[in-house]
Amino acid sequence: YEIMPSLVGSEMCIRDSIIRLSAKGQPFCFLAQRQKTMKQYEDKELLEKIQKYIGELSYTHEPENLYMPIEYVLGLGGKRIRPVLMLMAYNLYKDDVEKIYQQAAALETYHNFTLLHDDLMDKADMRRNRPTVHKKWDENTAILSGDAMLILSFKMMMESCPLEYISEVTATFSKAALEVCDGQQWDMDFEKRLDVTVDEYMNMICLKTSVLLAASLKIGAILGGASAEDANLLYDFGIKMGLAFQLQDDYLDVYADSSVFGKNIGGDICSNKKTFMLITALEKSSGK
C-alpha cells in the first residue's frame, strides 16, 4: 500500500489519499462502482455536519455530576477525524450521510472516553488547552463519567443501525475497542522498561491509535453497503494512517508550541512514556 506524503502533517487531506491508494497495483473496487449522480461531500462539509450533530447532543440527564463532564469533554472540540473518516467511507457508496451521524458520534464518544481515562492515568493537567476532567472535577468523577461514555458509545452505535449490518458493525467496533485497551496496557507496561524495541512500539501504537481509525473507515464502508474486500482495504489503509499520525504526535510532543498543541511539551517523555523518538535515542545511545 502507498500512503501519500501529503497525509503526514495534515488534518483532513484524507480523501485524495484514499482515492489514490491501490492494492497490488489495482484501484479499489468502489472506484468503478461510483454513481455519477451521487453527491460527494468535501471533508470540511462533513466536519461541519458532524460537529453540529455532536454539539446538539443533550446530556441533561440526572445525576448532573455524571453527565456534565461528558458534555464538557465532547465540547472541547478536536479534529473529529474518526467520525469524518466514517462519513467519508460511507460517502464512497452512498450520499445520505445523515443516516449514520449517530454511529459517527458514537465513535467520537468512545474516542473521547479513552482520552478522559488516558488523562487520568497519565495525571495530565491539560487537554486542548482546558483542564482535564479529573482536574476540573475529581478522579472518581472522571472514572465514572468515562464508564458512562463507554456504555453510551455502544448504545449509540447499535441504535438505528440497520439489522443486516448489526453483527458486522458490532464485531468491528468491539474488536477495535478492546484492542485500544490492549494498546493502553502495553503503553503502561513499557513505562517500566528501557529495552522496548521499535517493533514493539509500532505494535503498541497500532493497537492504541491505528485500530480505531481503521474501524472508522471499515464501519462507514459496511454501513454504506461496501463489499468485504473494499471494507478490509479501507481498514488496512486506516492502520497505516494511524501509524503516521502517532509518529507525528511523538514529534510534536517534543517540538510543538504548547499553545497550539494543547498539551504540555515533553509530557510523554517526562511521564516515562515510550515514544518513537525516545526509543530511537536510547538505541543510539547504547550503540545499537
Sequence positions of predicted segments:
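N-terminal amphipathic/basic leader segments beginning at the initiator methionine
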Residues: 38-57
